[in-house]
């Protein structure tokens, strides 16, 4: 098992304030976390807000809450540059007596930022002092404080956010360029009849004099002025800028300052979400204030001392595609407190009502997210040991996060440690790990290949019809699962690369992430335009679609007797998105 060697480079989460200040600025453990009854989320979605006057746009049907997380640069150490006054990016309600409550837009004087993720601050509005989450603030009058500035998010993540069908045409964000140091990128949602809902990306270049431009004939002294101009004039863009891309409050880094080993009495178990061989998962509340997920382990499952030592390493693993470990109760029965994911385990999601609406683009996107989380685990020299759909959690907007990393090593159950016992996940385990206990990141890659079959078959058990002993024998003899029905050969070929006998010949997670993120631009032949999947929608109801509006009707219309090129849809149709009577997307 490896441990963290350096501070993760991956950004934390955040959002920005929109209104311009003046006229020139603009995881054998049950992973399911879906309760039987609706629970109030710990964070709420902040809707997009118009930038200037928005022209009337036809409404695309379907919709969803936006991603659980949006990344941004870490701001720790900002005081070293002499900045002590920060502005609040979100509302925050105190969770302990030492926390400081504040409202979005409040100005805060930072007293001490040397103690990690929670800074001591003094509100210039209320006059009170207390600890605040550092990823909820940004330096005053900085670009980081702008609501439209999303920092170091990837092109793919920006598209995931902007392809929300509830976003009107012209919804936008500004991010750092992935390819040019010091440059920025303006990402804008667009719509046309050929592509449906799509995203255009414009590089923002920097002048030697310090100004900015997209086209050299129109230059600006600041990014704020650039955004203000293009909110009034398209001037070569696909559309003028209308709404800032909406997002949600980020997770705080930990529950509060010094809230790591917490008393059992501070947790309230409210809704049982699942039960497995080694314990249960509950939705609950910490300190009467904060929604969390709580894993309760059966006594004797693992040594409390070994668990606490491993948890110290696990809590240092921070990435937007890993479920965050918040706190622990280290005396038996051990409690593990993590962030709450509203849609439960990926396995349950695939097999449930929502799974039947997933199409290949969404499945590949989910696989890319998992590969992204595991690429971070790979960079940190860590090993998961139990990667499968049951240990992936799903949140809003089809966000997927890896859970239960590292815990499998600590289990002290004979039916598990024998590696061929009834509780051991043999069908997901690489042969060198199952036979000889050689768990490495390359055995995780093998497991990822099996997870891909779970995705493409909507949760089918791997190696159907085979028992564990037979699977191990057949795999050792060279057997590999055939291509699942309706799975592209190129994706099956990727699975087979993950299942190479020599671990060193298996791809890295970095490669897997890049392959999957670029899958539809680099591996597949063009598909007819009317079959082209063009976006993501979160399933708010079973009948909601996972495709963009026009694409859904063009793709599914023929089976209901409707012509793909028809511009109107009438009547009640089973399986159609919730708004049935609509004009197909027209800008």
Curated annotation (Swiss-Prot):
Entry annotation: catalytic residues: 386
Residue ranges of every copy of the SH2 domain listed in the record: 148-245
All residue ranges annotated as the SH3 domain in the record: 81-142
Entry EC no(s): 2.7.10.2
A Gene Ontology molecular function term of the record: non-membrane spanning protein tyrosine kinase activity
Post-translational modification summary for this protein: The phosphorylated form is termed pp60v-src.
Comp. bias (Basic and acidic residues): 7-25
Pfam family, one: PK_Tyr_Ser-Thr
Keyword presence, tRNA-binding: no
Top enzyme class: transferase
Lipid-anchored residues (N-myristoyl glycine): 2
Keywords of this entry: ATP-binding, Kinase, Lipoprotein, Myristate, Nucleotide-binding, Oncogene, Phosphoprotein, SH2 domain, SH3 domain, Transferase, Tyrosine-protein kinase
Family: Belongs to the protein kinase superfamily. Tyr protein kinase family. SRC subfamily.
Name recorded for this polypeptide: Tyrosine-protein kinase transforming protein Src
Organism: Avian sarcoma virus (strain PR2257)
Taxonomic lineage of the native organism: Viruses, Riboviria, Pararnavirae, Artverviricota, Revtraviricetes
